[in-house]
């Protein structure tokens, strides 16, 4: 099995952190390849950066997905998810949707932890778009830019655990979801400190991608996620232009 870890922002260290965390979870025989955006924000955190990231994501998918069995979107905004599911003949799994689906299996009301006060309104829109708005019972912001540095994720563990336990006590959450690809692999570190199940999105996405590949999940041939064909374009990468014409992209 060959899985593509795709990071639509331009922070190489985030891609490496996610890829290393996924490799540590991977079953024998599973190969992890990685790709990072060549343009756009260092960290995606605004509507404008998200719009740029959508373009970066589909360019990366068109170039790097051929030969892979599934794509893992390593951005907690699930950047390029719907476009990827349309464009590619292989499963595309994104970390926040995967975390929400997992949280639903572990409890009812969930809490959400993020690392930028501005981002919570954007995450609420994402959560509602995935159909989980009614289950969002609480959120907390651990307002630290340190988490976005190569050394910073470990430094916020105590604050994240405190935030989760506070939501459990004050708001009655039954599950906690951690945002941010930079927190990939944090679940086992945090769980012993927390009184409710902790779901880290990349772990959830990886396991779901593995399962979809093993299930032999098929590509829709009709409807909104059928592959595009005959779409002409200008000013985009050759691989993406070919995919829009119906000339390639992923395993068929």
Descriptions of predicted regions:
Residues 59, 144-183, 194:
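Glycine-rich phosphate/pyrophosphate-binding loop and the adjoining helix
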Residues 5-6, 65-75, 172-181:
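Periplasmic-binding protein-like
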Residues 21, 25-27, 33-40, 44-49, ...:
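C-terminal alpha-helical cap/extension of soluble enzyme domains
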């Amino acid at each position: 099995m060959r899985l593509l870890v795709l990071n639509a922002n331009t922070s190489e260290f985030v891609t490496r952190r996610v890829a290393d965390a996924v490799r540590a979870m991977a079953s024998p025989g599973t190969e992890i390849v990685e790709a990072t955006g060549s343009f756009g924000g260092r960290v995606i955190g605004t509507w404008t950066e998200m719009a740029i990231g959508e373009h970066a994501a589909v360019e990366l998918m068109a170039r790097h997905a051929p030969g892979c069995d599934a794509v893992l979107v390593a951005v907690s905004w699930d950047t390029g998810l719907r476009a990827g599911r349309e464009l590619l003949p292989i499963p595309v799994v994104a970390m926040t949707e995967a975390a929400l689906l997992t949280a639903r299996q572990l409890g009812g009301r969930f809490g959400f932890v993020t690392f930028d006060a501005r981002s919570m309104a954007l995450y609420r829109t994402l959560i509602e778009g995935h159909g989980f708005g009614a289950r969002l019972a609480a959120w907390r912001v651990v307002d630290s830019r340190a988490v976005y540095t190569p050394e910073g994720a470990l430094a916020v563990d105590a604050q994240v655990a405190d935030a989760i336990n506070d939501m459990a006590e004050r708001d009655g959450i039954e599950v906690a979801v951690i945002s941010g690809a930079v927190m990939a692999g944090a679940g086992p570190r945090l769980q012993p400190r927390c009184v409710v199940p902790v779901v880290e999105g990349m772990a959830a996405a990886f396991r779901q991608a593995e399962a979809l590949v093993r299930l032999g999940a098929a590509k829709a041939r009709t409807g909104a996620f059928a592959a595009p064909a005959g779409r002409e374009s200008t000013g985009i990468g050759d691989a993406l232009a070919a995919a829009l014409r119906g000339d390639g992209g992923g395993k068929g």
